[in-house]
A protein has these predicted regions:
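Flexible loop/hinge segments that line or gate small-molecule binding clefts
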Residues: 133-174, 254, 280-292
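Short acidic/polar active-site loop segments enriched in Thr and Asp
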Residues: 19, 65, 125, 186-187, ...
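Short, well-structured alpha-helical segments in soluble
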Residues: 114-123, 232-243
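N-terminal helix-turn-helix DNA-binding module of bacterial transcription factors
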Residues: 1-66, 339-342
């Protein structure tokens, strides 16, 4: 993927219908331009993603030996160190160590579409964007800039984009449902998140297809990722009010811990009455009582695939993606029944 040369000050001046000097004055807060003209020029420069910084313009013309990592799920959460959620640090650690083995540095970048954008952020050799959203503005920015990128998880808005890798989530979800069924479950609830990414969208599609294949009526509940344990506990009460199921699969460990707390308050025994599992392992699932069955994501293998895809994309080579890796489902006490007829 060839990088674009970027927007120049002359491009901004032409779009705004003013001189190059006027653009410079508007962006630097100098000169005698009217307030209206200054605001209009700045708005046009921002719309065109113009980089006024000379360092950024210079770096963009050559390799800097560094790539960016954008954690879209953390951007959406509004916090970058959620308590007890270690899956993101595992991906960050794996990507950083493996990149260094290849002579690359990794820069963690919060949503680069939010102003002001650090100049270096748009001068990196490429990007890994995790869990892109529908019509993701970060992907849009990278596309406009001609910056090579790959994604952790498919881009739901770009079905023809193949430079992505992830765990085989469809297989993982089906394995959990089959585990529930083998332990006697005849009614299974899915609690998913609300972020508009492929993980949420595809997991619900997988769940509904599996339910149809075995003749189970689907029951889907949603709780915003940022609601965490509190959101899971609230949903647990709604689930019980609607009819206690044999099993519940939650997307996140925080949701699962909250659901466990809510079920306990309502007197629903886990796993004897209702089995429980999470699609993403965390401190919450490991330290709950009972410990909650969960999918341990394969950060090491997945980030290796992402780096392979990104380096090939930077070099302009054909896509070898998508790549699916294998996660591990850890069965714990929350879904382990001694009597499968319970």
């Amino acid at each position: 993927m060839a990088r674009s040369k970027g927007v120049t000050i002359r491009d901004v001046a032409q779009r705004a219908g003013v001189s190059v000097a006027a653009v410079s004055m508007a962006l630097n807060g100098t000169g005698t331009l009217s307030a209206a003209t200054r605001l209009r020029v700045r708005a046009i420069a921002e719309e065109m993603d113009y980089e006024a910084d000379a360092l950024a313009r210079g770096l963009r013309r050559s390799s800097v030996g560094a790539i960016g990592l954008v954690m879209r799920s953390l951007d959406a959460l509004g916090e970058y160190a959620p308590r007890g959620v270690d899956v993101f640090t595992r991906y960050i650690g794996a990507a950083s160590a493996q990149a260094m083995d290849r002579g690359l540095s990794v820069m963690l970048v919060p949503d680069p579409t939010k102003r002001p954008t650090p100049p270096l952020a748009l001068s990196l050799d490429g990007y890994i964007v995790t869990m892109p959203h529908v019509d993701d503005p970060v992907v849009g920015l990278l596309e406009r800039r001609g910056i090579p990128y790959v994604t952790l998880g498919r881009d739901p808005s770009r079905p023809n984009f193949t430079d992505w890798a992830t765990e085989d989530e469809g297989s993982s979800f089906r394995r959990i449902y089959e585990h529930f069924a083998a332990s006697g479950a005849r009614s299974i609830v899915l609690l998913r998140g609300t972020d508009p990414n492929a993980w949420n969208i595809d997991s619900e599609a997988t769940y509904r297809a599996w339910c149809e294949s075995v003749g189970i009526t689907p029951r889907v509940y949603m709780s915003a990722e940022r609601a965490g344990e509190h959101g899971g506990e609230n949903i647990a009460h709604a689930i019980v009010d609607d009819g206690i199921p044999d099993a519940i699969l939650c997307h996140t460990g925080r949701q699962a811990a909250g659901v466990l707390a809510g079920l306990t308050v309502r007197g629903v025994a886990v796993p004897d009455r209702t089995m429980l599992a999470a699609a993403s392992d965390s401190e919450h699932t490991r330290h709950s009582r009972p410990a909650i069955s969960a999918v341990e994501l394969n950060a090491a293998e997945t980030t290796l695939a992402l780096l392979d895809l990104l380096q090939a994309r930077i070099a302009g080579e054909p896509s070898a993606g998508p790549v699916l890796t294998t996660a591990r489902f850890r069965v714990r006490a929350s879904s382990r029944r001694t009597d499968t007829n319970a």
